[in-house]
From Swiss-Prot:
The basic unit is a heterodimer which dimerizes to form tetramers. The heterotetramers trimerize; 6 large subunits form a core ring with 6 small subunits projecting outwards. This is Ethanolamine ammonia-lyase small subunit. Keywords: Bacterial microcompartment, Cobalamin, Cobalt, Lyase. Pathway: Amine and polyamine degradation; ethanolamine degradation. Its cofactor is adenosylcob(III)alamin. It is found in: Bacterial microcompartment. Catalyzes the deamination of various vicinal amino-alcohols to oxo compounds. Allows this organism to utilize ethanolamine as the sole source of nitrogen and carbon in the presence of external vitamin B12. Its EC number is 4.3.1.7. It comes from Escherichia fergusonii (strain ATCC 35469 / DSM 13698 / CCUG 18766 / IAM 14443 / JCM 21226 / LMG 7866 / NBRC 102419 / NCTC 12128 / CDC 0568-73). GO terms for cellular component: ethanolamine ammonia-lyase complex; ethanolamine degradation polyhedral organelle. InterPro entries: EutC, EutC_C. Belongs to the EutC family. It catalyses: ethanolamine = acetaldehyde + NH4(+). Pfam families: EutC.
Length: 295
């Protein structure tokens, strides 16, 4: 699927919702991740700010305009300069700050107040705390007994599409992107005439937990929105794992279709919602997902 097709899907879904299509993602990226390059070191600079990310550490460059253009074209750690064989102080401090931010989002919990504010039913896997979640991934693939009973009692049975939200390895990915991806996703699925299940939040969930959820609720397609393992300085990236007619005993990873890198610096959440709606429709038409789908 090329960019032109994606933009057409976005316009179609947003039009069916009665909303204007979002501006091209390039423009939004330019305003959120790019800033005027800075060349001087400063102890007062916020290491997580756009100014810090735009910092150029190469001293006395032969072609400063080339470095400026390169720095604006990527979020990679380029043009940071050297102090002999070592990185410069500001480059090292930013590296450490980004690493700390990534560790923080793995260890943080999604606040219960936030889940209640979104009106979501909350259930959990067999995991009871974050430490166990990180050390026993197998337990994160199964719902606890209380969760099974809650889903049976409070969720729509036999939906065409069941949407599930889980914290995964990034709390920020859920809390930052939720409002921009779930409402248009739910609206788009309903506009497509599909029977949509009750969305809910799974605490301490792993990807394979969607297999049990699909079996339990009799869903044809299960869509799991889960926080990705964060990279350096990128703690807000969300992934979508979609699977057709999942089964705990037989579904393997190749049966899933994944859309990753959903955030404002990657695939914008609103655009991702439109792509997921189109994906769910094709899964139902082809009765397949993952490598079994025809391109």
């Amino acid at each position: 699927m090329d960019q032109k097709q994606i933009e057409e899907i976005v316009r179609s879904v947003m039009a069916s919702m009665g909303q204007a299509a979002p501006a091209p993602s390039e423009a939004k990226c330019a305003t959120t991740t790019c800033a005027a390059p800075v060349t001087s070191e400063s102890c007062a600079l916020d290491l997580g700010s756009a100014e810090a990310k735009a910092w150029i550490g190469v001293e006395n460059p032969h072609r400063a305009d080339v470095l400026t253009e390169l720095r604006r074209s990527t979020v990679a750690r380029v043009c940071t300069g050297r102090a002999g064989p070592r990185p410069r102080t500001q480059a090292l401090l930013r590296f450490l700050a980004d690493h700390s931010r990534s560790k923080d989002t793995v260890l943080k919990e999604v606040p219960e107040e936030w889940v209640k504010a979104q009106g979501l039913l909350e259930v959990r896997s067999e995991i009871s705390d974050k430490n166990l979640y990180l050390t026993r991934p197998d337990m994160g693939r199964r719902l606890c007994a209380e969760a099974v009973e809650a889903l049976k009692a409070q969720c729509v049975a036999n939906p065409d599409v069941q949407v599930v939200i889980s914290d995964g390895l990034s709390t920020d990915a859920i809390t930052v992107n939720y409002e921009e991806i779930l409402p248009p996703l739910m609206a788009g699925l309903k506009q497509a005439g599909l029977k949509v299940g009750t969305p809910f939040f799974v605490r301490y969930g792993r990807v394979k937990i969607e297999d049990q959820i699909g079996e339990l609720l009799g869903a044809k397609v299960v869509i799991l929105l889960v926080g990705e393992r964060p990279g350096l300085g990128q703690s807000e990236s969300l992934s979508c794992y979609a699977v057709y007619s999942p089964c705990m005993a037989t579904t393997v990873e190749a049966d899933r279709t994944c859309i990753s890198n959903i955030h404002q610096g990657g695939t914008p959440p609103v655009e991702a919602a439109a792509v997921i709606v189109d994906l769910a429709k094709r899964m139902l038409e082809q009765k397949a997902s993952g490598i079994n789908m025809t391109r």
